[in-house]
Amino acid sequence: MRHRNGLRKLNRTSSHRLAMFRNLTNSLLEHEIIKTTLPKAKELRRVVEPVITLGKNPSLAGKRLAFDRLRNRDNVIKIFSELGPRYQNRNGGYIRILKCGFRRGDNAPMAIVELLDRPEAGIISNDSAD
């Protein structure tokens, strides 16, 4: 019986799935917003949130665990210097998944995954216009 086995296999081998979620996690942490399919986005939440939670308590063991899961030194530094303090008062729920229609080629449901409380990009201030 398959009781409480909630892992989505996504038609991939375990090594391919691990590499795919590692790449998606690194992209999300680097750009703070990505577009992917809805099942990948829902499964990505289970990978990203524990990694960000590691950044809330800066320790050497936590940094080693984060590097083991990400294999990207720049993103590990970002987790512990930026994201950990940003989400210090939030107990989980660090990402937002928004449905954004269907992919043109195969009609797969798409989603936008973004980190909450991210700084707004592309806003031009009019302070120096005078």
Swiss-Prot record:
Keywords: Ribonucleoprotein, Ribosomal protein
GO MF, one annotated term: structural constituent of ribosome
Keyword check for Ribosomal protein: yes
Gene3D superfamilies found in the cross-reference section: Ribosomal protein L17
Domain of life of the organism encoding this protein: Bacteria
A GO BP annotation: translation
SUPFAM superfamilies recorded: Prokaryotic ribosomal protein L17
Pfam families per the UniProt record, alphabetical: Ribosomal_L17 (PF01196)
Keyword RNA-binding attributed: no
UniProt GO cellular component terms: cytosolic large ribosomal subunit
PROSITE patterns tied to this protein: RIBOSOMAL_L17
Family: Belongs to the bacterial ribosomal protein bL17 family.
NCBIfam families per record: L17 (TIGR00059)
SUBUNIT field: Part of the 50S ribosomal subunit. Contacts protein L32.
PANTHER family linked to this entry: LARGE RIBOSOMAL SUBUNIT PROTEIN BL17M, RIBOSOMAL PROTEIN L17
Protein name from the UniProt record: Large ribosomal subunit protein bL17
Species this chain originates from: Nitrosomonas europaea (strain ATCC 19718 / CIP 103999 / KCTC 2705 / NBRC 14298)
Protein's gene: rplQ
